[in-house]
């Protein structure tokens, strides 16, 4: 008998084995890539592990923060205290109230007074405590700011020697001092403010760095706080003041402990 040639005629189908073999290889490669991506082997119908409570909370807080900042016309620009606009997150305004009631300062220094909404709010809190006054500085002298016997406005840069000296002269011996920084939020400026004003705050009181949420466009208040705390053991970030979850001042509620 002659040998049978292993050929396929022009009108015959080619065997499927090579095709199936190639498909199987591609499938296995895809599975391997998927396993490497997920970091573990799993069945296609295996449920994903449930998210932790902290992960769920973080996602919800981030979602709220995004909504809050994307809708400033109905949030930041539409927040009032007794008819006057206050550019503050209400949750943070409440924390200020708790701090001032728990440990009332004699002097609250504010950098970045703008139209005086926050100063007016602080003055109302001091009225209820029957003590305290506000020293606040802004680059521009706005004429339509609220007038209150507890508020003294200064015009100039918060980091100028003249303004700092004016504040120091206004503080009487033995007075308790609290400071909140809410002017230029770029890192270099905030860090300079921290270096200048940290010595004015009395032990047990707060140095608040406002708007410390990280800015993707430039180093800001958060980076200033991080650098400041590395070199100053007199302060700690009081995380208990972030109890509501959302704050515009993360790591910014600095308490002087020594």
Question: What residue spans do the PLM features occupy?
Answer:
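A short alpha-helical cap/connector motif
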Residues: 4-5, 9-180, 184-258
């Amino acid at each position: 008998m002659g040998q049978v040639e292993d050929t396929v005629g022009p009108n015959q189908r080619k065997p499927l084995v090579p095709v199936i073999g190639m498909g199987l290889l591609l499938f296995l490669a895809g599975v391997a890539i998927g396993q490497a991506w997920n970091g573990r082997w799993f069945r296609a119908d295996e449920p994903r592990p449930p998210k932790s409570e902290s992960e769920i909370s973080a996602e919800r807080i981030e979602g709220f923060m995004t909504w809050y900042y994307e809708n400033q016309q109905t949030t930041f620009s539409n927040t009032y205290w007794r008819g006057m606009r206050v550019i503050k997150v209400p949750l943070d305004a409440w924390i200020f109230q708790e701090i001032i009631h728990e440990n009332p300062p004699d002097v609250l220094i504010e950098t970045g007074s703008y139209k005086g909404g926050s100063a007016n709010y602080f003055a109302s809190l001091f009225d209820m405590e029957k003590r305290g006054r506000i020293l606040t500085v802004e680059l521009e002298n706005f004429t339509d700011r609220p007038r209150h016997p507890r508020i003294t406005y200064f015009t100039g840069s918060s980091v100028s020697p003249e303004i700092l000296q004016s504040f120091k002269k206004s503080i009487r011996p033995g007075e308790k001092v609290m400071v909140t920084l809410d002017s230029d939020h770029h890192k270099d400026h905030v860090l300079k403010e921290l270096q200048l004003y940290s010595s004015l705050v009395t032990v047990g009181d707060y140095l608040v760095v406002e708007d410390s949420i990280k800015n993707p466009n430039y180093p800001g208040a958060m980076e200033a706080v991080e650098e400041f705390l590395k070199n100053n053991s007199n302060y700690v970030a009081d995380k208990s003041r972030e109890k509501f979850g959302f704050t515009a001042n993360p790591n910014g509620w600095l308490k002087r402990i020594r």
